Amino acid sequence: MRTAAKGNAAEAAVLHALIERDLNVLVPFGDGQPYDLVVQIPPEGFLRVQCKTARRKKGCLVFNARTTDHGKGRLPYVGLADLFGVYFPPTQSVYLVPVRDAQTYYGWLRLDPTRNNQRRRVKFAAEYEIERWTIDALAGLLKAGRAPLRLAA
């Protein structure tokens, strides 16, 4: 599948999963923003979601956690988006990962148990499944992460 088609499939899957959870989702016009979707969290504000496709590697889901290089180098999404909406095509699973939880070049979510039973500093995929995110948990991201985005009146 072409890169653009993969991105479109991920965006559609994340959009569908968010709408299924009765969340209001806005889709920005054009490709000029560093995020693909915006989720309204009333009355707090809005969360920006960057959609990514994950692949399986070494018992983990791996996704690109940097922006596309447009002559500026590959930059982190910190301050540009709030969440990664991560889609894993083989299982059609969607995960929501706060950008602050994936600040390296790649985001890693562990699917398989670690060989040494380590849990510290391991991000288990099950903890980020979209089904685990309540409206209160999403609102907590706004309160903890940054000032809420507000639409002009």
Where are these regions (language model features)?
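Mixed-charge (Asp/Glu-Lys/Arg
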Residues: M1-Q33, V38-A153
